[in-house]
Amino acid sequence: MNIKKFRILFFFNKKYSYLSTIKLKEFHLNHWEKYNNKLKIMENIPNGKKRQNTYLDGGSDFDVNKKTRLVLLNERGVSGRIPTTANIGEINNKDNVLKTFDVCNSFNSAFENDKSEELETHHDKIVGLKIPTIHDTIKTEKKVIIKKECEIKDVNPNDKIGGSLENDKIEGGLENEKIGGGLENDKKNELPEQVRKNVNVIVTWNMNSITVRYKNKEKWKRFMKFVNEINADVLCFQEVRLPALNISKNESKNVNNKVYGGKKNEGEERNRGSVKNTDQKSLIDYKIVEEILKNDFKEYNGYFSLANIKYSGQLVLVKKSIKVKSVRYNLLFETDPNIHNDEGRIILLEFSNFYLLSTYSPNNGFDQTKFKRRSLFDNQMKEFVLFMKNENKNLIWTGDLNIAPEDVDLSHPIEFRKMKKGNVPKEYIGQPGCTDAERANFKTILKNGDLIDSYRYFENYKIKNDPTYKRKTNINDNIYTWRCPFLIGKSCNRAMRIDHFIVSKNLLNQIENIEIHGYSVFHTNFYGSDHCPVILNMKK
């Protein structure tokens, strides 16, 4: 009886094994036919960097280079495999934009298991999700093409090297788009003269990194509420800390913004009017800035001037309803206006009735190198404002000027004025921003340009003409624009007024008031930065 059972079991297992083998062969044959059909699209493809996929209904384009291989496309013209670690922003498929970030893993899983129904379902979920890009007007007729990430074995020295981003290019995506562009973007959004308006409200703010500020959603939301409440026409942001776009020498010939090397990466050419997006790390910041400009400041045109690295740099935003007549990124009128300061410290815009200069003036520091750098900048400012005065050009100079003109602009004047490191000349003793040398240069700048410190002017005017008005002296009052970021320690509660609106005397009668937005040792209305916004209101 046991032997019979054993024979039956043996026969059953053998038959089951035979059936499994047949099924397995059918499975492989079926998949080989599918794979072989897909390979037919490559039979007559010529060698070269551009090839044409003639699969089914007209096909779609894809590129091939030494660092990538061909990726098969399904009936929809979409590669089944989406790299989960690749830098994929938007993928344009005619009028549809596919959002891939949240569905990459499930999409890949469906493809690997050859579950066509599941793949179809995922695709239907993806299509229809719309992601705004930095240029709404840009449309592409290409289908979705993705180059799969792969290891690089042989690299041509002439090829661009940019990590996985260079290996995962998306046709019609962010690779060909740049944040910035200045007047080129302004012209695209140009309004008829009769609907254009004048500048009424200007805000200056040292952000101490635009991406860091944005990541704190609660504080950023409060900042945007403030911007919308005052209905700012122009926003001048300093220290945005975004690297400039690096470009090849051939590309630099076609770039409007002149480029040249900085302290780091000497000789590497940059487009200082655009944000870097050529590697994974920079692409993260690029996407944040794109989102800010597209969602929060969609009614504004942006003008960038950036350094080589995440240091310094500026962004000026102007409402599209206001005409910008010209833009300059240096202080020398005899030179090309598109030559930038190599640390992005200067943006000069011309409006109908005045020029607006936004600067992130160099910190004086505590050593001879920094002293010379600040002195050189101040000397350029002396010549610039003198030229503006002689040409009868009204000027509003704003930004983080890194100067406290008087002791009243210091929370602890005695301590600030004694600070030093090592043996330095007497005129450089003191906290950077309040040394005798800096103050002397600042006074000369005001004199040469016939300029006025507008905040101090209006404060003194109130004290002189309004008996009920008393000068604010409390550490918690809104009289300082910079406050020490530390709430404990030797420097806690220290504060200075170093962000300004310096204006031509001819413009004083057009200004309503100057307001320092932040206050308190707890940094109220500083929105995460060590500086607070300052507001200039023009008379309407």
Curated annotation (Swiss-Prot):
Keyword Transport: no
Places the protein is found: Mitochondrion
Record note on disruption phenotype: Normal growth of blood-stage parasites. Developmental stages in the mosquito vector are normal with no difference in oocyst numbers and salivary gland sporozoites. C57BL/6 mice infected with knockout sporozoites have a 2-day delay in the appearance of blood-stage infection and have reduced parasitemia. Formation and release of merosomes from infected mouse hepatocytes are normal. However, merosome infectivity towards host erythrocytes is partially impaired resulting in a delay in the appearance of blood stage infection.
Enzyme Commission number(s) from the entry: 3.1.11.2
PTM section of the record: May be proteolytically cleaved.
Reaction(s) catalysed (UniProt annotation): Exonucleolytic cleavage in the 3'- to 5'-direction to yield nucleoside 5'-phosphates
Transcription in keyword set: no
GO MF: DNA-(apurinic or apyrimidinic site) endonuclease activity; double-stranded DNA 3'-5' DNA exonuclease activity; endonuclease activity; metal ion binding; phosphoric diester hydrolase activity
Cofactor binding notes: Probably binds two magnesium or manganese ions per subunit.
Positions that bind Mg(2+): N206, E239, D400, N402, D530, H531
UniProt keyword list: DNA damage, DNA repair, Endonuclease, Exonuclease, Hydrolase, Magnesium, Manganese, Metal-binding, Mitochondrion, Nuclease, Transit peptide
InterPro entries given in the database record: AP_endonuc_1, Endo/exonu/phosph_ase_sf, Endo/exonuclease/phosphatase
Listed Gene3D superfamilies: Endonuclease/exonuclease/phosphatase
CC annotations in GO: mitochondrion; nucleus
GO biological process, one term: base-excision repair
Residue segments, region Disordered: 256-276
UniProt cross-references to PANTHER family, sorted A to Z: AP ENDONUCLEASE, DNA-(APURINIC OR APYRIMIDINIC SITE) ENDONUCLEASE
Family: Belongs to the DNA repair enzymes AP/ExoA family.
Biological function: Multifunctional protein that plays a central role in mitochondrial DNA base excision repair pathway induced by oxidative stress. Has apurinic/apyrimidinic (AP) endonuclease activity towards double-stranded DNA (dsDNA). Has nucleotide incision repair (NIR) activity; acts on dsDNA with oxidized bases thymine glycol and 5,6-dihydro-2'-deoxyuridine. Has 3'-5' exonuclease; can use dsDNA templates with 3'-OH termini including blunt-end, gapped and mismatched 3'-recessed.
Protein name according to UniProt: DNA-(apurinic or apyrimidinic site) endonuclease
Biological source species: Plasmodium berghei (strain Anka)
Highest classification ranks of the organism: Eukaryota, Sar, Alveolata, Apicomplexa, Aconoidasida
